[in-house]
Amino acid sequence: MSITQWPTSERPREKLLREDAHILSDAELIAVIIQKGVRGCNAVELAREWLNHLGGLASLLNADFHRLSGLRGLGKAVYCKLKAAAELQRRYLRQSLERKGQLGCTQDAQQLLYAQLRHHESEVFACLFLDNRHRIIQFEKLFYGSINQASVHPREIIKRALYHNSAALIVAHNHPSGVPDPSQADRAATTHLKEALALIDVRLLDHIIIGDRNSFSFAESGLL
């Protein structure tokens, strides 16, 4: 049944206008973005089909075009709409924390870094440069590939910290496997980096590993 044949009170766009976006299901929100379905399948049904096939919203928004192109109704135009929506969410979160200024807690950093790194399908190592009041100066993605002592170059991180006149920083990388448990290489790289930064009086506040649905904090776990 076409959405236009639904009672007005049940249509996603009308529900959003009448109340707010937070009351809509994931499928309904996607339907608002894509606007139309395909023959015999309305936008909500189509979105629900994609979510069921991929295992949820995160998998849908993080997948590349090659993976999504086999789903019916998901062409280049729809893919671009979904990617744009996901990127807007990441930028909104980042700018909200930047306007807030000081990072109030580890959870603030985890929330920001999760949004920035979760969607990558290979490992990415990033730095959040902070001033002496733990206000965000800059966020940068520095290294790509397997994260270990050989691939994470303290010299480059030190150079960027000095450039930003940073007093402290938080580093993070993602685990594409979805499991955020630290490896021995993660532990060794963290220790090596902490010692290198101490030589220029820059504090390493945390190393956060981003998983599929949660994250791991070296600081919270007493490993820093």
Curated annotation (Swiss-Prot):
This protein's name: UPF0758 protein CBUD_1789
Extent of motif JAMM motif: 173-186
UniProt entry keywords in alphabetical sequence: Hydrolase, Metal-binding, Metalloprotease, Protease, Zinc
InterPro entries named among the record's database cross-references: MPN (IPR037518), RadC_JAB (IPR025657), RuvA_2-like (IPR010994), UPF0758 (IPR001405), UPF0758_CS (IPR020891), UPF0758_N (IPR046778)
A GO BP entry: proteolysis
GO molecular-function term, one example from the UniProt record: metal ion binding
Name of a matching Pfam family: UPF0758_N
Domain of life the protein comes from: Bacteria
Record-linked PANTHER family: DNA REPAIR PROTEIN RADC (PTHR30471), UPF0758 PROTEIN YEES-RELATED (PTHR30471:SF3)
Family: Belongs to the UPF0758 family.
Binding site for Zn(2+): 173, 175, 186
Residue ranges constituting the MPN domain according to the UniProt record: 102-224
